[in-house]
Amino acid sequence: MNADPHNGDIFTLCDIVRETGFEIYKYLRSGHREKIYENALAHRLRKRGISVEQQQELRVFDEDGTLLGYLKADLLIEDRLICEIKGVRSLVDEHIAQLLGYLRASRIEHGLLINFGGPKLE
């Protein structure tokens, strides 16, 4: 894919991340710790010139502005896409809720949940 992830729409960026995740899955297959997949995805995206921050700390506030605590998203890509990595047999509702919590806390609109642990990439 030759699209520019810096200036393109979010769908182009998501396509690049999914494509890169699939390449990693074909190479590594399942069975590794999540951190291995996180590092692999961050590394390959950076090689493509895409900005990636790992274990990005997200602050959670109460409605009055009081800091309640922190969450850590696996990957923040181009400052506009949160990517949560899993290495489980299959995704469950709690995984989706976790990503949605990260999106609310960060006020970022878009997220991807990628599972490398199943018989096929999810």
Predicted feature locations:
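A short, surface-exposed helix-loop junction/capping segment
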Residues: 17-27
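Nucleic-acid nuclease catalytic cores
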Residues: 86-122
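Active-site metal-binding core of divalent-cation-utilizing nuclease and nuclease-like domains
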Residues: 30-80, 88-89, 119-122
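Short, low-complexity, charge-dense intrinsically disordered segments
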Residues: 1-9
